[in-house]
Regions:
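Bacterial Sec-dependent N-terminal signal peptides
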Residues: 1-20
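A generic alpha-helix surface/boundary motif
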Residues: 4, 38-42, 105
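Secondary-structure boundary elements
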Residues: 18-95, 99
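Mixed-charge, low-complexity segments
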Residues: 21-24, 46-47, 161, 189-335
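Helix N-cap and loop-to-helix transition residues
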Residues: 39, 53, 88, 177, ...
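Hydrophobic/aromatic-rich core segments of domains that either
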Residues: 63, 105-175
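Active-site rim recognition segments
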Residues: 75-78, 142-218
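Gly/Ser-rich catalytic serine loop of serine hydrolases
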Residues: 100-104
Length: 335
């Protein structure tokens, strides 16, 4: 908490020296009708109608987010990650408040609607060799020239003063080259460094990027494409494997890894419960089919059926029971 206050206060003294790069979009974005402020889709449609160039569209979206969302200091440590992304964005639009994840998801939602490949990056930050006390979230966009750039709408939205958020726009973290972003932002997953030779945590903490080029080149674009095709559970497992591969030394990285393991445990449990429910439904189906045979037998096998049809009335439920038994055995203990 003290770190964030210090960081944002530090930024406050540099704001006056920053040119207003938003001058070519702010007047237009301030004129957006109230009817188009209620969803990311409507905001994106407005931007698309007013701007055609890539840089202008992204800048307009960024400006809208940082100028319309204020840092919610009262809920800094109480982010509800259970709600869906759509619900989180809707609440951010309605309340005009949020912490880093709200800024990031709101910005991502708009630029995604505009057709850009935007990813949310989670990690931790530092300023003047002081590491933040809590993790952080920002964005990265793959531009049409296939180059990745980083964006941090939270840090560009204002600063804290005397326990209150002061709205003061900046552009220091707008469209930053990945290697520059790494001076202050360290992703938990090295994939999001967008470097051929990813740096280590130790390099980040010391501020000295060695980038061992004797290593094999890391094809991050291919890895990202494969990663995005995975299910959420598989993505978490993918992240876990990369964190194990590189090691995780910092306090926040260790905390993220512990949360990651718990998330995977929950996914595993939920998957087992779903499988158990499916097995139960299939077993009941077998019971119903077998009861049909019992009723038919009690009716003295009337009306008449061919032998192969009668055998099928027995073999089908028995096959279901056998399959259920095998699935239960593979499932093991649940709960």
């Amino acid at each position: 908490m003290k770190y964030i206050i210090y960081l944002l206060l530090f930024q406050a003294f540099t704001f006056a020296q920053v040119n207003n790069i938003y001058s070519d979009v702010e007047k237009t974005m301030q004129s957006i009708p109230e009817s188009q402020k209620k969803s990311s889709k409507e905001i994106a449609l407005f931007i698309k109608d007013k701007f055609s160039l890539e840089d202008m569209q992204i800048k307009a979206a960024y400006y809208y987010v940082i100028s319309n969302v204020s840092y919610d200091i009262t809920h800094e440590f109480t982010v509800n990650l259970v709600i869906s992304d759509d619900e989180m964005v809707s609440k951010t639009i309605a309340s005009k408040k949020g912490v880093c994840i709200h800024y990031a998801k709101f910005f991502k939602d708009i630029v995604t609607q505009l057709g850009y490949n935007c990813q949310i990056v989670s990690g931790y930050t530092k300023k003047d060799n002081v590491v933040a006390e809590q993790s952080h979230a920002w964005c990265a966009i793959k531009m049409k020239d296939n180059k990745w750039f980083a964006f941090d709408p939270t840090w560009d939205s204002g600063f804290l003063q005397n326990g209150k958020f002061v709205k003061k726009l900046n552009s220091k973290y707008f469209k930053i080259k990945p290697i520059e972003m790494l001076k202050s932002h360290m992703p938990f997953d090295y994939m999001w460094q967008f470097l051929d030779y990813p740096i280590t945590e130790q390099e980040f903490l010391k501020g000295k990027f060695i980038q061992d080029k004797n290593q094999e080149i890391f094809d991050y674009d291919t890895v990202i494409k494969k990663h995005n095709l995975l299910s959420e559970n598989e993505q978490l497992s993918d992240l876990k494997n990369r964190m194990i591969q590189t090691g995780y030394k910092s306090k926040l990285a260790k905390e993220r890894f512990d949360i990651l393991k718990k998330q995977l445990d929950v996914y595993s449990l939920n998957s087992s419960i779903k499988e158990l429910n499916d097995i139960n439904a299939k077993y009941n189906e077998g019971i119903n089919l077998f009861n049909e045979f019992i009723y038919y037998r009690n009716a003295q096998f009337r009306p008449e059926k061919e032998d192969k049809e009668i055998l099928k009335m027995i073999s089908t439920p028995l096959a279901i029971f056998e399959d259920c038994n095998d699935r239960i055995y593979k499932l093991g203990f649940v709960g």
